[in-house]
Amino acid sequence: DTTIRPLYPDTRPKVLMSDTVGFIKKLPHDLVASFKSTLDEAASASLLLFVVDASDPSFRSQLDVTRKVLAEVGATEVPSLLVLNKRDRLGPDELAALKAEYPDAFFLSTRNKEDLQALRERIMGYFESDMIDEELRIPFTAQGVVAEIRAKMRILSEDYDAEGLTIRVRSTPENLTAIKKKLAR
């Protein structure tokens, strides 16, 4: 079954991570249909992460199988990031060769907290690339929108004074437009 969890710690905007079962090369015929049905959501994903054990000599064929199955469910146009895990099990020459072969891949060891944080930042960087930073002035008479701002936008800074709140946010243009309309009322 597919597991869906928010990226932790919580992010604004919320990023949901969907973990599907791993790809198995010789899947029994009776499981193929149910397996593919769990992948239908991949076609509507914003970003696909291919997490692969870089120390497994057969990871390239596993990656090929993954890409073929995703093509079958119509997910070839979905942006993706190749994540090569278990870099701690590779020698320096192996790691250098893989970095040359997969220059856009993200290399990590899930045993290393800094690597996990860097992956989280890379994921957030993808989602924040289309966002803009803006400063909003919210008078005390319009404080009702603050909860919505906190729910949908990343707060960069906030300052209260005698007239209200000045808040600097990072958000999608759509969310900013909606909040500005509410503030203009």
Place the predicted regions along the sequence by residue:
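A general structural motif
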Residues: D1, L27-F35, R87
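Conserved C-terminal guanine-recognition region of P-loop GTPase G domains, centered on the G4
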Residues: T11-K14, F35-F107, I149
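Flexible beta-alpha connector loops of hexameric P-loop NTPases
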Residues: V21-L31, V51-F59, N112
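Canonical P-loop GTPase G-domain recognition
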Residues: T76-L81, R87-F140, G144
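NTP-binding/hydrolysis catalytic cores, primarily Walker-type P-loop NTPases
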Residues: I132-R185
